[in-house]
Each structure stands twice: as C-alpha cells, then as structure tokens.
C-alpha cells in the first residue's frame, strides 16, 4: 500500500512544490489543479507521439514536457496577477476551469473526434531497488514494486527545501513573499 501511495503521490508532490514556490513569493496559486491537468495531457500526447523514437527515455522526457507546460500555465497566472493586477483567486479559477475543457477539446481535435487517447506505450513501470529491498520490513514497504518518479519527487522536495531555506535566493523569495515592497 505504501509503495502504491508513493507512486500516486509523485504528481501531487511536484505540483505542491511548484505551489510552495508560488506561495512563498506572494502569489496565491489556486490554479494548480488546472496546471496539473494540462501537464498530464501534454505528457500523454508527447508519449503517444514520440514513444517509438525515444524508447525507454520517453516517460522521463514526457515528465519534463509536463513540467514545462505547467511552468507555462503558471507564467500565464503570474502575468495575469502581477502585470494585469487580476485577482489571484479569479485567475486561478479560470485556469482550473479552462484546463480540463482545453484538454478535452484538444483530445477531440488531435484524435479525430474521440473523447480519449490511446493507452500510452512507454511508462515508468515498477522497480525494486536491489540492495534496499532486502532490508527487513522497511525494504518490502518502501523499496519493492515502486516507481522511480516517486523517489525523484522526494529528492526534489529535499532540494527545494534547501533552496528555500538555505540559499540567498530562498531568503529573497521569502522576504518578497512576506512583504512585496521589500
């Protein structure tokens, strides 16, 4: 159960980390769900189109594509709230409402009127960590039949913690978020 929870929590961890940077900088981003939907949609489309060419690297590159699309939608939210002075909640709600509709529309356009895509060809699959899976009790819970992106998400969370709380950039980010005139 724990390994399945780790697998399914990876997208939420990555999205939560993006939201943490947004909140720490003083931008309330309620559009994270819409950002996640568009990232997932773009990753699936990428995977379906390039799986034959890229092979086993396809899911990892699709993960980067999903992150780039997520950054794009976050930039739209940032421009709307900072430059255009839109309300944070309204802008985020628009992204949350626009993203699923846009994903369904693009699915119908790209896949000839069908409301769904084909199954992805290349996925991350499940892995067991060779040495760590042999640890009594803990090895079976955390390191058997799990997915590598889950551990990449946890490692990214640790890196983000270091960036936010131990670097000059993080100090500036937090100070601007607490007091925008700083």
Where are these regions (language model features)?
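Membrane-interfacial amphipathic/re-entrant helices at transmembrane-helix boundaries
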Residues: 1-16, 28, 42, 51-62
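Hydrophobic alpha-helical transmembrane segments
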Residues: 2-5, 34, 38, 60-68, ...
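Hydrophobic core segments of alpha-helical transmembrane domains in multi-pass membrane transport
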Residues: 15, 40-44, 100-104, 150-163
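Short, non-helical or kinked segments that cap or interrupt transmembrane helices
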Residues: 20-42, 82-95, 172
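Alpha-helical transmembrane segments within multi-pass membrane transporters and channels
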Residues: 53-100
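Mid-bilayer segments of alpha-helical transmembrane spans in multi-pass integral membrane proteins
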Residues: 75, 97-110, 123-137, 163
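Pore- or pathway-lining transmembrane helices of multi-pass membrane proteins that form conduits
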Residues: 83-111, 115-122, 153
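Alpha-helical transmembrane segments of multi-pass integral membrane proteins
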Residues: 133-174
């Amino acid at each position: 159960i724990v390994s399945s929870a780790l697998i399914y929590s990876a997208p939420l961890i990555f999205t939560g980390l993006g939201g943490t940077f947004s909140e720490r900088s003083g931008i309330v981003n309620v559009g994270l769900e819409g950002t996640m939907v568009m990232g997932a949609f773009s990753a699936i489309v990428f995977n379906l189109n390039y799986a034959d060419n890229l092979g086993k690297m396809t899911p990892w590159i699709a993960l980067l594509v999903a992150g780039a699309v997520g950054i794009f939608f976050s930039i739209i939210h940032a421009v709307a709230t900072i430059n255009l002075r839109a309300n944070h909640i309204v802008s985020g709600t628009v992204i949350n409402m626009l993203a699923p509709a846009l994903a369904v529309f693009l699915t119908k356009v790209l896949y000839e009127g069908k409301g769904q895509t084909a199954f992805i060809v290349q996925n991350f699959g499940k892995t067991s960590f060779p040495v760590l899976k042999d640890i009594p009790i803990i090895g079976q819970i955390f390191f058997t039949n799990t997915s590598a992106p889950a551990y990449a998400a946890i490692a990214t969370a640790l890196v983000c913690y270091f960036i936010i709380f131990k670097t000059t950039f993080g100090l500036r980010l937090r100070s601007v978020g607490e007091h925008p005139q700083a």
